[in-house]
């Protein structure tokens, strides 16, 4: 344990916290170009084909991004907006593509949590006809 005199002379060393999304360089989002769009399988207890894309960001970094929602229109050379946010069952995937921005279309026929998937508000008359629920 240091003496008061030692603390006055040197002070405490600050512990810098490590960024969870270093490729964004402190920005909320970054633009990038899809280099490869493919599916991959999740870690042990889960089973699925998760849609992911390898994206080259505008700052030169190349990252693996998750494509959220059901169905997508992304292919090689698509321009996408990338945000932070990991996918727990996909090792090495620490970023997500923002749906409804740039070349990534919003999820079709999405009724709930629309803002997260870039889906527009359904027309009032159409909504009642398409939902399968009774009142």
Swiss-Prot record:
Region ranges (Disordered): 1-29, 106-135
GO MF term (any one): tRNA binding
Modified residues (3-methylthioaspartic acid): 89
The entry's keywords: Methylation, Ribonucleoprotein, Ribosomal protein, RNA-binding, rRNA-binding, tRNA-binding
Origin superkingdom: Bacteria
TM spans (from-to): none
Function, as annotated: With S4 and S5 plays an important role in translational accuracy. Interacts with and stabilizes bases of the 16S rRNA that are involved in tRNA selection in the A site and with the mRNA backbone. Located at the interface of the 30S and 50S subunits, it traverses the body of the 30S subunit contacting proteins on the other side and probably holding the rRNA structure together. The combined cluster of proteins S8, S12 and S17 appears to hold together the shoulder and platform of the 30S subunit.
Family to which the UniProt record says this protein belongs: Belongs to the universal ribosomal protein uS12 family.
Subunit structure: Part of the 30S ribosomal subunit. Contacts proteins S8 and S17. May interact with IF1 in the 30S initiation complex.
Protein name as annotated: Small ribosomal subunit protein uS12
């Amino acid at each position: 344990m240091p003496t008061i005199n030692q603390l006055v002379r040197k002070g405490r060393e600050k512990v810098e916290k490590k960024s969870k999304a270093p490729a964004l360089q402190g920005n909320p989002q970054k633009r990038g170009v899809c280099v490869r769009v493919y599916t991959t399988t999740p870690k042990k207890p889960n089973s699925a084909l998760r849609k992911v894309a390898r994206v080259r960001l505008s700052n030169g970094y190349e990252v693996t991004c998750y494509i959220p929602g059901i169905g997508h229109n992304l292919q090689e050379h698509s321009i996408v907006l990338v945000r932070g946010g990991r996918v727990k069952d996909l090792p090495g995937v620490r970023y997500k593509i923002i749906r409804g921005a740039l070349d990534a279309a919003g999820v079709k026929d999405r009724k709930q949590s629309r803002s997260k998937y870039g889906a527009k508000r359904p027309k009032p008359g159409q909504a009642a006809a398409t939902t399968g629920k009774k009142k």
